[in-house]
Structure formats: structure tokens, C-alpha cells
């Protein structure tokens, strides 16, 4: 099925990443050098701006919309301005969900959907009686990568088969 559409950039196309960086390179410079935004992060077309007050962010959002309009680009319309919580228990804000993680001031967690997929795969593998340690490690190493850079040590110890845990962690560190 061919969809004739001229809006946006094709998702999943290798050129999409290149075009996103090409189109937004000057935007990055404008944000950092001219607008002097201290905390700005971008992955392809996902952007995060951090500031001391909501007012600063509302002004910045207005300026960004004007800048992008000059390039004939628009924001998706799902932008959000909110306080970031100290940790998961803090009810005076929320975590920042970005690139597969949920960031708080003092902790980083895996996104819930990634954690659920990790747990499901580990449970499926833990039920197999005749799985080799090598196959077990190969199936779970990518999720281990997510877990090791977040605050998920307890999760790892809980879901990985105890007989594989020590060698699993060593093997994944070597990969």
C-alpha cells in the first residue's frame, strides 16, 4: 500500500534521522547560543527544555513556535510544561519520560512499558527448563543495558534466574 503524503518525515526511514538533525542543527545553535537555554536535550525530533520557572518555559515555547514557523515546521501539539518530581514518591511533580527512561531529580527509572517487556521475557525464559546460560544471556542482554544505567539493581536480582545472575551480569558487562 502506497500512501501519498507530503507532510512530515517517514518514520523508520534511515534518512529521517539525518533530515531531523539537518533541519534542526541551526535550531540547536539558536536555542543554546542565542536563547541561552542552559538545559536543552534533543533526540531526533523529541526535545526537552528545563528552566527555573514555568513562565520562562512559556516564553521559550512561544519563541520556538515562531522560529519553527519561519522554517515552515510546526510542533506536534503535545508539548507539556510541568514540575519535575524529586523522586517517584514526590507528589509535587512528575518524572520526565524521555528516550525510554523516566527521570527524576535523584533517580532514573526504566519506562514502564520497557520494564514490563523485560519482566515478561525473563518470566518466559525462567519457565524453560532446558535453556542454556548462553541463550538466556543473549535474550536478556539488551534489557540489561536499560536496567544497568537506571536505578534497577533490585529488579535485576528479582527477575533473573538466580543460577544465571552472577555469570549473566559479568557476561553482559563484557559485551
What do the PLM-derived regions correspond to, one by one?
Residues 4-6, 58-59, 77, 81-175:
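Right-hand nucleic-acid polymerase module
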Residues 1-44, 48-65, 71, 78, ...:
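Conserved polymerase palm-domain catalytic core
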Residues 66-67, 121:
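Juxtamembrane helix-loop transition sites at the ends of transmembrane segments
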Residues 70-71, 158:
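Juxtamembrane/interface motifs at transmembrane-helix termini
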Amino acid at each position: 500500500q502506497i500512501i501519498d503524503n507530503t507532510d512530515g518525515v517517514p518514520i523508520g526511514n534511515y534518512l529521517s534521522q539525518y533530515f531531523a538533525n539537518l533541519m534542526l542543527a541551526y535550531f540547536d545553535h539558536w536555542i543554546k547560543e542565542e536563547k541561552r537555554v542552559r538545559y536543552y536535550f534533543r533526540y531526533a525530533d523529541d526535545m526537552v527544555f528545563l528552566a527555573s520557572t514555568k513562565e520562562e518555559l512559556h516564553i521559550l515555547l512561544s519563541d520556538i513556535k515562531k522560529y519553527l514557523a519561519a522554517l515552515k515546521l510546526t510542533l506536534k501539539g503535545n508539548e507539556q510544561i510541568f514540575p519535575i518530581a524529586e523522586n517517584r514518591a514526590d507528589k509535587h511533580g512528575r518524572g520526565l519520560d524521555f528516550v525510554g527512561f523516566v527521570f527524576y531529580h535523584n533517580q532514573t527509572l526504566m519506562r514502564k512499558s520497557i520494564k514490563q517487556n523485560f519482566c515478561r521475557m525473563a518470566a518466559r525464559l525462567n519457565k524453560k527448563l532446558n535453556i542454556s546460560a548462553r541463550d538466556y544471556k543473549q535474550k536478556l542482554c539488551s534489557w540489561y543495558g536499560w536496567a544497568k544505567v537506571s536505578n534497577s539493581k533490585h529488579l535485576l536480582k528479582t527477575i533473573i534466574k538466580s543460577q544465571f545472575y552472577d555469570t549473566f551480569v559479568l557476561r553482559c558487562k563484557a559485551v
